[in-house]
């Protein structure tokens, strides 16, 4: 028996800091009991993954497996630093993933390798312990099946479904081989049973070969090895069947199975140089080939001269009966992964904790939003009240209003002022007068040329008349535009005249009222303003308290150790909401805010008795009037510019019509002159007296 060791996977040192921080967040008690479990986790990883474990390390495998299960149950699979492992197909290539499932799959893979290595060692003993080796091969197959059932990690090349299934079938084929060796060494076992066991051996190797061949990341050596093993055991199977046939005097059948056995043996020997396997494998095959050739040659001679029995036609061989005596066995160390293990018991489930923290954040966000709205409301009220109070004590309101009025005047001045507006309007008047004059001249000229052309029948035939009529129609369409420009000019003149009166009146009124208001003095209210500022200080203190509340986290309201006392999330959140309400005390917050606002309102009502309402109302009207005047100025200026653009475009269109008219007029005169010349020439040269001297070219045929 020859076996090939499953390639092992190696790993490297790993940082537990991210996992430690997450466990610290999830711990329910300040006594960090999870630290001991984490130390155990690191120690076992070094023992089982960094070094080479043995079959005596099964208890350590079990503990590490349980620790991983607990961390996965608490949804901490992705809260870890990257795990780095080599690929099974190449020890020089590595893959790295931040996931406990990947680490767990690698651990079970190493457990499978441990069982497999131990099984091969038992087979190589003298005498071999085939029964125990068979069990370990089945346990190794069970490990790969366990990975396939629970720890498929498709991102890794080593843990795709086809490759894991190939390893499982390969281990089962080796286990069935042990049973064959045990049965073959027992003289009491019948050949029919041995054949059935052997048939299952080569079928298992055949299945493993197909899976390895199609699996991504499969080591190429195992593709060749399973193929050779399949052919080797096929050869032996058909050799035993041929001997059974010979013993039953079925000589033709014996020869057919010998040929089939030799065919598979030669097929296996063809791979001699494909891969560097142990020379012993091919030495066995060569000896087997020689034996089969000798036996086939001898039996063919006997059958040809003595027995004369027909051989089995190619393709007519019956299917072989098989017996399966192995199966994948899940090791005891891989107990139920859903069981409750006594590790990290002080840590909450991550998903539960994340859900709680999300709800707590929503509760706190709602509280912050409510207090912000309350603060904003109070700030707006107090700001408005304080602005009114300050306007009573000083002339700031008057000054600000004066500045705003002056800003409006300055804006008008920067745009050119009334003189600039009148200048632009005057330019527009000139342009529109020019448009009217050009339009009338063009229409008059077209009418004259149309009347002149009507008397000339020859010109009508040449299309001149239709061109002039078409141009006349186009020019006539511009009449509406010319009239609109004239109307716009008249309207603008009226608006500018009215605007000049408004701006003069505004200037006189604003100067008079603002100068009168500036001379008035408000009563001394310094003492009352000090009182108002004290209310503002109380408000600032209240806002500082609220800002401190907004900085508090969930642990400041609800000790995390209390989570262990509430299995129901609704009751837990109810307690948290009550704790937040007790600390924020929204009712008390609103009462304190209302008291401050009421005090300021009383102060404002008292100060309003000193305010000169009439003047403030009048100055507001001045400000409004100045703003409207600025808007009207901008509107008039823009209107003048727009009408100027329209008039300029209209003038260009009429000028182009005049150019076309000039072209038609020149064309008309040129055609008349040419016609006169032609008439004179035709009357003077009616007959050519030298016509008999003209020589004509003869046409050549």
UniProtKB/Swiss-Prot annotation:
All copies of domain BRO1, residue ranges: 2-378
Point out the coiled-coil segments of this chain: 630-678
Q: Which UniProt keywords apply?
A: Coiled coil
GO cellular component terms given for this protein? cell division site; cytosol; endosome; mitotic spindle pole body; nucleus
* Gene Ontology BP, a term: vesicle-mediated transport
Question: Which InterPro entries does the entry mention?
Answer: BRO1_dom, BRO1_sf
Q: Please give the positions of the paired cysteines in each disulfide bond.
A: none
Q: Which SMART domains match?
A: BRO1 (SM01041)
> In the record, which residues are listed under signal peptide?
none
Any stretches that span the bilayer, and where are they? none
Q: Name one Pfam family in it.
A: BRO1
User: Family assignment?
Assistant: Belongs to the palA/RIM20 family.
Q: What is this protein called?
A: pH-response regulator protein palA/rim20
Q: Which gene encodes it?
A: rim20
